[in-house]
């Protein structure tokens, strides 16, 4: 291939595709960060604005990350907590109202702790673009004693 020919994504190796700079959405960046941090189990319940996190993680090699849709957000959190109890780094993704569904295991887990890393990626929906309500997850996390990393410019 000469220098003038374009490289289609299909022509690149997986390593080349991951190391070349290209813009990412916020959800893709969360997935990439999880993969780079060694997350091996990812579970989620689909709901905008968080759906693309698991969809992006599912594009990585299945031997590297087990990405699965769950029946609901509580089940997604249970899967991630179970993996973290076994020393595996895990992630559960959901939208803000899904955190309400997962409240029981989340509130209990924060006092039990984990053996592997555990990340809950919860996407709020300010302005109610695709949800039935607007809530501030930071307040929920404060109640549950969960540290919060908040994206900014």
What are these regions (language model features)?
Residues 14, 20, 29-32, 84, ...:
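Homeobox/homeodomain signature
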Residues 5-19, 34-40:
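Generic N-terminal amphipathic, Lys/Arg-enriched alpha-helix
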Residues 13, 17, 25, 40, ...:
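A near-ubiquitous, low-amplitude feature marking generic local secondary-structure context
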Residues 22-56, 78:
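N-terminal glycine-rich anion-binding loops that anchor highly charged ligand groups
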Residues 48-142, 147-149, 153:
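Thiamine diphosphate
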Residues 15, 24-27, 103, 131-133:
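Sparse, context-dependent recognition of short Cys/His-centered cofactor- or disulfide-binding micro-motifs
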Residues 2-7, 19-25, 108:
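Hydrophobic, small-residue-rich alpha-helical packing segments that form membrane-like cores
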Residues 17-24, 39-41, 65-70, 146-149:
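A short glycine/serine-rich beta->alpha loop
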């Amino acid at each position: 291939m000469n220098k003038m020919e374009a490289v289609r994504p299909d022509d690149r190796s997986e390593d080349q595709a991951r190391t070349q700079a290209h813009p990412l959405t916020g959800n893709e960046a969360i997935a990439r960060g999880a993969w780079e941090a060694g997350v091996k189990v990812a579970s989620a319940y689909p709901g905008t604005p968080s759906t693309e996190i698991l969809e992006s993680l599912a594009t990585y090699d299945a031997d590297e990350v087990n990405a699965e849709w769950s029946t609901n957000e509580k089940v997604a959190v249970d899967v991630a907590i179970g993996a973290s109890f076994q020393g595996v780094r895990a992630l559960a993704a959901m939208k803000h109202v899904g955190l309400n569904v997962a409240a029981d295991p989340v509130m209990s887990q924060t006092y039990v702790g984990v053996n592997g890393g555990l990340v809950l990626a919860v996407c709020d929906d300010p302005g109610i673009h695709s949800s039935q309500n607007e809530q501030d997850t930071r307040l929920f996390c404060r109640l549950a004693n969960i540290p919060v990393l908040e994206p900014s410019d």
